[in-house]
Amino acid sequence: MKLLKRLVSVFAIVLAVGSNAFAGDEVRIVIDEGVDGARPIAVVPFVGSAPEDISKIVADDLRNSGKFNPIAVSQMPQHPTSAAEVNPEAWSNIGIDAIVIGQVVPSGNGYSITYQLIDTVGASGTPGTVLMQNSYTVTNKWLRYGAHTVSDEVFEKLTAIRGAFRTRIAYVVQKNGGSQPYEVRVADYDGYNQFIVNRSAQPIMSPAWSPDGQRLAYVSFENKKSQLVVQDLNSGSRKVVASFQGHNGAPAFSPDGSRLAFASSRDGVLNIYVMGANGGTPTQLTSGAGNNTEPAWSPDGNSILFTSDRSGSPQVYRMDASGGNATAVGGRGSAQISADGKTLVMINGNNNVVKQDLTTGVSEVLSTSFLGESPSLSPNGIMIIYSSTQGLGKVLQLVSADGRFKASLPGSDGQVKFPAWSPYLTK
């Protein structure tokens, strides 16, 4: 048995600043469209009880990816508690080729979580083979994290893609009233364990993660002007890195974390600049007619996507990271490239989230929600979070990159916008 604490050292950093600033009204996933075309799988209810339902969390994670469609407990032909009890034929007869079983039992001041992933059709050689198994000891506080760890391991074993269920999201909440209605918050990717990073009487916009997950850059209108702030999530310390005349916005860390791209109208026209992540003299990358904003780095750091209306209406362009050689990509704005460099996600002219295959140029609409904004990819490129308008307010939406699964994360205490998905927070 290994202690899960060994795995959470980096992840725990993002909890430190929020330890005394817990936000009680969390955003939670509400399913809008299911995953009927995805791979069926069974997550059998784990034996034992704990403050969190481990098997439900695992099933929800797998469903949220769009890759799997966990069957209902009522459809399961048996509830085995160990590999020896599994009847492979009973599962294969209903189209299930893999099942997850496990148990959760008290252990000291926490719980021991044990699971097995079992092949029921013999794809690995023999039906009933244990494909993966593991055991963790966690405190009550880390029970959901323990479940997400199971999900990550099962997902990677079955898809050969690293799981991203132990990542987090940052976003801005504009509360309904109060002296400091604007807040930057961070939560688990599914909306749980939310806490406040910073609150202000003035607007806050566009949080962006550093590639090591230890800092957030965002726009603050404190002192009645737009400033770029970088905040350390371990210590809580904040530093204003850009406070130039005019507007300063849309920060984006370079892939190595050493630089910030941002938009500024310091010279009267909104252009893209780059400077050190701790501030310094900026280098201007764009020029000429039109406004240029929303920079986003390519994974290799060699190019930058941005939004410009230089041609008369907003669309996405791509240029060298040093400036120059700008070419139109399409869409309307808010572009981001997946970590493997193969897929572009952006907002199109109808305010829908679309993905574009950068090899073939083929685009696919993933959302048809009203006024989609600020799409952000999970680090494995499997899920996308964005904001949209519902009624008179803003909410977060989750969609799998294949479009199979759609869900909303409504906030109960205000408008929720500017989501940003963290990088991986574990080694």
Swiss-Prot record:
GO terms for biological process: cell division; protein import. It holds the Pfam family PD40. Its main location: periplasm. The keyword Transport does not apply. It is found in: Periplasm. The keyword tRNA-binding does not apply. One of its GO terms (cellular component) is periplasmic space. Keywords: Cell cycle, Cell division, Periplasm, Signal. Residues 1-23 form the signal peptide. InterPro entries: 6-blade_b-propeller_TolB-like (IPR011042), PD40 (IPR011659), Tol-Pal_TolB (IPR014167), TolB_N (IPR007195). Part of the Tol-Pal system, which plays a role in outer membrane invagination during cell division and is important for maintaining outer membrane integrity. Belongs to the TolB family. The Tol-Pal system is composed of five core proteins: the inner membrane proteins TolA, TolQ and TolR, the periplasmic protein TolB and the outer membrane protein Pal. They form a network linking the inner and outer membranes and the peptidoglycan layer. This is Tol-Pal system protein TolB. The gene is tolB.
